[in-house]
């Protein structure tokens, strides 16, 4: 499940944990076969609406065949992972592939909507998997909402990209992959209006010579991507998720910004 804690005093104290994404015993399967992971939070800076995305895995697909396994019960020990083997497959159906869910709150996180399943409108049916990237999304200067996202292509190879909404979260669009064999990522809007995507590069696993974050930019909402000059050079990583944040501040009445990794 995906949980959330709220603080009303700047982080001095925290309210009890709320469960905000939970499919319970959906489809008459035990809760352990309705897990939700990879939470990503996004605040619409125009309306104050808070969005949280998560990846729902219903049931289990066979490691070798990728087919749905019937007759699962609380005592079943069968297990698979959406990023391993054939744990998530092409298609958009609930018994074919993991599902991309989004819930939202319009009262500062007190209550949350029933989740919207955007798998059908965003996932390329050839892709094996489409998922949020853990972390946070952003609101662009023009009001566009952007989630950092990730997936597995038609060959099962991972990629990173973005998913965005230009109508206040009513509909969502998936961009083209920014780079192959990358996964968890974070996005920022640069001062020129382009989007920078900072990505985990799985080529770095076990590699101690070249071990930096893959970095790409786009000026057309991810239709095309350009590798940044600092890609795999500036930011060292242990092949894991990481955060990128644009901090905007004023100095001598002049608006400035810095990127924090």
Regions found by a protein language model. Give the residues of each.
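Asp-box/BNR beta-propeller blade signature and adjacent active/binding-site loops
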Residues: 1-261
């Amino acid at each position: 499940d995906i949980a959330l804690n709220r603080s009303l005093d700047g982080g001095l104290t925290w309210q009890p944990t709320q469960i905000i994404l939970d499919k319970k015993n959906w489809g008459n399967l035990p809760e352990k076969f309705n897990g939700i992971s990879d939470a990503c939070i996004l605040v619409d800076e125009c309306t104050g609406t808070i969005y949280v995305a998560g990846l729902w895995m219903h049931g289990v697909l066979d490691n070798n065949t990728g087919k749905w396994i019937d007759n699962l019960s609380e005592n079943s020990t069968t297990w698979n992972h959406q990023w391993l083997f054939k744990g998530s497959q092409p298609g958009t159906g609930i018994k074919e592939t993991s599902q991309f869910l989004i819930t939202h709150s319009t009262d500062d996180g007190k209550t949350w909507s029933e989740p919207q399943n955007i798998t059908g409108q965003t996932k390329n049916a050839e892709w094996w998997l489409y998922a949020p990237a853990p972390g946070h999304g952003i609101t662009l200067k023009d009001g566009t909402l952007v989630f950092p996202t990730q997936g597995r292509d038609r060959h099962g190879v991972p990629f990173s990209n973005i998913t965005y909404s230009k109508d206040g979260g009513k509909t969502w669009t998936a961009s083209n992959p920014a780079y192959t064999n990358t996964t968890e990522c974070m996005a920022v809007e640069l001062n020129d209006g382009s989007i920078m995507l900072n990505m985990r590069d799985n080529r770095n696993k076990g590699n101690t010579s070249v071990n930096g974050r893959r970095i790409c930019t786009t000026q057309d909402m991810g239709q095309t991507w350009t590798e940044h000059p600092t890609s795999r050079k500036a930011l060292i990583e242990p092949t894991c998720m990481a955060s990128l944040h644009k901090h905007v501040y004023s100095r001598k009445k002049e608006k400035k910004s810095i990127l924090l990794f």
